[in-house]
Amino acid sequence: MVSMKQVERQKLNQKLMRAAATGDIEAVQKLVLRGADIYCRDHQGDTALSLAAGSGYLDILDI
């Protein structure tokens, strides 16, 4: 059974991926502070940082 904490963490990680891929540095910072995992990977094996870098949002890599 999946716990509510696991579901919440997964939602945070999904939001982090979207924020990183679109260059929303403020959202990335807030999500990391709330517990999003910068090392999590999406279904293609990409991390939030690799999505940010691949989209040209290199300032996110400094977080």
Swiss-Prot record:
Pfam family, one: Ank_4
Alphabetized UniProt keyword annotations: ANK repeat, Plasmid, Repeat
ANK repeats: 11-43, 44-63
Keyword Magnesium: no
Keyword field contains Magnesium: no
PROSITE patterns named among the record's database cross-references: ANK_REP_REGION (PS50297)
InterPro entries noted in UniProt: Ankyrin_rpt (IPR002110), Ankyrin_rpt-contain_sf (IPR036770)
Protein's UniProt name: Putative ankyrin repeat protein RF_p14
Origin species: Rickettsia felis (strain ATCC VR-1525 / URRWXCal2) (Rickettsia azadi)
